[in-house]
Regions:
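PRPP-associated nucleotide enzymes
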Residues: 1-188
Length: 188
């Protein structure tokens, strides 16, 4: 559902789109050795892809990589920062096929930073994102796999709450808004 320039994804819609992404990767014939899910947004996508791969006959190693530059809705802090990146990138070897998974590819800044680190290992990287915003891309990169071009619309993922007003929370899910309001009253 789209309201005021924000697209509110349901959990089912997001999960089904992630499975479509997994099917697109498998249909390409390119099989990764390792799946790196970019924490936070890519984590649920990574879980869905890994499960889909596993039940379809692919056993792919997987690990999350915490990275980010966003400080809020539409607010980009600048430099991409990795937490424990040396550990994750240190696992990669020349010739490894690495599938990097994220929820959305917009500016391409995160993808570019990840690609630079993976390229330095000699591994081959491909990028899979559920959603793509080509109009926001500031790099020469694009995802190798994606499900939907979402234009410039801001996506509110099923798990996202921070930055939403009480009205937006009610729009997203009235039961959720009530739970949050009750907990806020108890805590404050």
């Amino acid at each position: 559902m789209a309201i005021d320039g924000k697209h509110y994804l349901s959990g089912d819609e997001y999960l089904h789109d992630a499975w479509r992404l997994a099917a697109a990767v498998m249909s390409s014939g390119w099989k990764p050795d390792i799946l790196i899910a970019l924490w936070r947004g890519g984590a649920p996508v990574g879980v869905a892809l890994h499960e889909f791969f596993k039940v379809s006959g692919w056993d792919v190693r997987h690990i999350p990589l915490k990275c980010g530059s966003y400080t809020g809705i539409g607010e980009n802090a600048g430099e991409v920062v990795f937490t424990h990146g040396d550990i994750v990138f240190g696992m990669l070897r020349k010739g490894d096929r690495v599938l990097v998974v994220d929820d959305v590819f917009d500016t391409g800044k995160t993808a570019k930073a990840v690609k630079a680190r993976i390229d330095a290992t000699g591994a081959e990287m491909r990028m899979a994102c559920v959603y793509w915003k080509p109009g926001k891309n500031t790099t020469d990169l694009k995802p190798d796999f994606f499900v939907k071009d979402v234009g410039l619309e801001w996506i509110v993922f099923p798990h996202e709450l921070e930055g939403l007003t009480p009205e937006e929370m009610r729009t997203k899910d009235p039961d959720l808004a009530q739970l949050v309001a009750e907990c806020r009253r108890k805590v404050n």
